[in-house]
A protein has these predicted regions:
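Conserved RecA-like P-loop NTPase helicase motor core
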Residues: 47-168
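Conserved helicase motor "Helicase C" RecA-like lobe of SF1/SF2 P-loop NTPases
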Residues: 23-48
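Short helix-terminating capping/connector loops at secondary-structure junctions
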Residues: 9-13, 39-44, 116-121
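Helix N-cap/beta->alpha junction signal
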Residues: 20-24, 76
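IQ-motif-like calmodulin-binding regions
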Residues: 180-247
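Short, well-ordered amphipathic alpha-helices
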Residues: 2-4, 27-35, 105-111
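Conserved interdomain linker/interface between the two RecA-like ATPase lobes of SF2 helicase motors
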Residues: 1-21
């Protein structure tokens, strides 16, 4: 809930859909009371729908969500493709959602534009829970963590954002050429925020994993070949060249 609160305040979010694994989790998230999201975000109206609801009950809730000034709706097994949903500013995957098709469809809802607003940016939020053991660096903790939802979300975003796909391609190629990369361009697409850790260190560690998990191995090998050509004047890499065995 705190990550949702921070994102809403930072990016002036007006409409949010949250995705949950179970009806109980979704309903609890938007419950009216101290445990619900409304208790943390002033002037927010929270709603809930799920796949067990009849359309006669769900439709008025969806209208209220669409017509409200600042609204959030939680759902479980409901707001998939084919269900009429208004344009939203952000979708949030608050529990694991493994189907790539579902993730692509959900992120598409955040990417949709609306004639009634001046919206230019859609947001996808995925909370990260990072456990750092004693003596472990943040980079090591990120490498060990299972951030499958992040990688799936970024894979889905590439379906809607060609610039993101191009940025990741160039980062992988740059790492092949220079043994490192500059993630400044990625910061405009992927932002990390939260308490208690060095966010720059965490961001760079996550960027490295993005390059590994989302980028193409071919692009990195191409970068290595570019570096070899710059050093030797040709692309005739010896079969057992020790510096980049991948070539």
């Amino acid at each position: 809930q705190l990550s949702i609160k921070d994102a809403i305040e930072k990016y002036c979010i007006r409409k949010v859909i949250t995705f949950h694994k179970s009806v109980a989790a979704a309903s609890s998230f938007t419950a009216h009371g101290p445990e619900g999201i409304e208790a943390h975000v002033p002037a927010l109206q929270a709603f809930h729908v799920n796949g067990n609801m009849a359309s006669g009950k769900r439709d008025p809730i969806m209208r209220a969500f669409a017509e409200g000034e600042r609204t959030l709706i939680s759902n479980a097994r409901c707001l998939t493709e084919g269900v009429d949903v208004p344009a939203v500013d952000m979708v949030a995957f608050l529990t694991p959602k493994r189907s790539l098709v579902d993730i692509v469809q959900a992120t598409g809802r955040a990417m949709r534009t609306s004639e009634s607003t001046n919206k230019t940016t859609g947001y996808v939020l995925v909370p990260l829970f990072l456990e750092q053991v004693e003596g472990e660096t943040i980079e090591e903790a990120v490498a060990r963590a299972q951030f499958d939802e992040v990688w799936a979300g970024l894979q889905a975003l590439q379906e809607h954002d060609e610039v993101l796909a191009e940025i990741i391609l160039h980062m992988r190629e740059e790492r092949g050429r220079t043994k490192g990369f500059n993630d400044q361009d990625l910061q405009g697409r992927v932002e990390v925020f939260g308490p208690s850790v060095s966010l720059d260190t965490l961001r760079h560690a996550i960027s490295a994993q993005i390059v590994d998990q989302i980028g193409s191995n071919w692009d990195e090998r191409f970068g290595e070949l570019v570096a070899f050509n710059a050093q030797h004047g040709d692309c005739n890499v010896p079969r057992h060249w020790p510096e980049q065995r991948g070539l």
